[in-house]
Amino acid sequence: MNALAGRRIAKVSGTPGKTRMLNVFEMPAYYLLDLPGYGYAKASHTDRHAFRHLIRHVIDRPRLTGVLWLLDIRREPSDDDRAMQELFAERETPVLAALTKSDTLARAARARRAAELRSALDLEEDQMVVTSAREKEGIVELREAIAGLIQPRTA
């Protein structure tokens, strides 16, 4: 999110799954909501259930324009990822998947993993952007894709 904003708006932890509450960031043309991770978070069963409830509540909001779904390109989709994709499809929620941490893979492996994830999660090519915050890869493309996602709502 910091790379997307072009400045430090979110605290970054070295440990995945540290987000425990809804964080809202005002961007120039939209609001970005950072939700707790539903799958990788090292949280109690009760907390994970509460995270899922919060996510469903946000997805059901009528003003929701779309979801920016951050997925680690190195990891296989979890059962939780598949359940979220089913929820997005069921609710007809527009989805844009940002495949993060691409700098950890060779270029050929990035393309292969993107294709595998696209297939596994039943996404279209224009619903995915390969990104690396460290290398600033895909950030411009991600901003453009977000603009395309919110354009119908703001036009």
Region locations from a protein language model:
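Short, glycine/charged-enriched secondary-structure capping and boundary segments
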Residues: 2, 45-48, 82-86, 111-114, ...
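Conserved alpha-helical scaffold flanking the Walker A/P-loop in AAA+ ATPase domains
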Residues: 20-27, 52-60
